[in-house]
Amino acid sequence: MFGWEFPPHILGGLGTASYGLTKGLCKQQDMEVTFVIPKPWGDEDKSFMKIIGASQVPIVYRDVNYDYVKDRIGNVMDPEEYYRLRDHIYADFSYMLTNDLGCIEFSGKYPDNLFEEINNYSIVAGVIARTENFDIIHAHDWLTYSAGIHAKQVSGKPLVVHVHATDFDRSRGNVNPQVYSTEKNGFDHADHIMCVSEATRRTVIEKYHQDPNKVTAVHNAVTPLDPEILAIPDKRGVKDKVITFLGRITMQKGPEFFVEAACKVLQHTKNVRFIMAGSGDMMDQMIRLVAKRGISDRFHFTGFMKGKEVYEIYKASDVYVMPSVSEPFGISPLEAMQCGVPSIISKQSGCAEILDYAVKVDYWDVDALADAMYALVSYPAMHHFLSEEGLKEVNSIKWEDVGIKIRAIYDQLLS
């Protein structure tokens, strides 16, 4: 399985979904997953599967002794694994820039030379595919499709690509031709395509001209909260109500609609504060918009948050809002609902297909969004109902069930 990020080092929902999905799959006794990421940090959860870092896979032979390898990468990889991979280098990659172990360095992020890293990752995938014993190749999102294709060419094994988003979602239609080409190439080479929602499935079929018979919607789920998160004290109940937006502050997420709706709410009640948690290329623009609307004293920008910090924000919030213009799925409302926070989501989000106990509005309908915000902070009975029923609903949406659906697709491909 190829991915680009994995907890605790994540920049969005892709890593969170990768973790939940792999854990759900591994609940099946006869399922073993090897998960490949560009750069491991050593603190990933390896309790249920094997993790390989592309930055520890040699593509050029280096004659190095065991102790040296252990000293260099022993915190993230067993030296024996390094030698096993080294024995399966299949071509002369001496023209590539490699380090003292014959490995390519990866940033583990989304650098300016992203397409170069994607290409390098696909080279490493070939070595891994020649070394590992496996039945299926599963590639998460466009960044890993080239790696999946190369692994398929090397091994002859079936390729499943998992669409967490398309460039039509990320760009509001202003599609990057290079990204589109990478995505379409992945879809064309895939034996099956999984999409995180029916809306994404339709996009893949219509915009990328794929056979509907090989495209399936497999909705995401949510990971049960661990005791450390459950122990975070509930900070609601002070005088002011808190309404939160949490996510990348980018065009796709619709942050400007949150600000405009907040302005309308404050025309009717002053006992509300707004949090915009996250970072992104529209953050400065949103700070200026808040100042222009004269609501800076009611607005808080926290910057990027991760891990426990995210749940501390949920536990301090009365309402969660996700006004995304295009959201293939959207795990964050499910996480908020786990903390008993009623959620308002856009009808243009994939999670709207499976959630009954969330308020749904069109992303562009600022009046409807403001009405929903106002209602949830003004009517305790409505707030209590959605808090209780929403919690029950998300507790029934399990990654284990997603794993069973994915297993059925695997079995179909292998039969």
Residue map of PLM features:
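A conserved catalytic-core segment of Leloir-type glycosyltransferases
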Residues: 31-129
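Short alpha-helical donor nucleotide-sugar binding micro-motif in glycosyltransferases
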Residues: 304-305, 312-317
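Short hydrophobic beta-strand element within catalytic cores of glycosyltransferases
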Residues: 342-345
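Conserved acidic donor-binding segment of nucleotide-sugar-dependent glycosyltransferases
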Residues: 358-367, 375-380
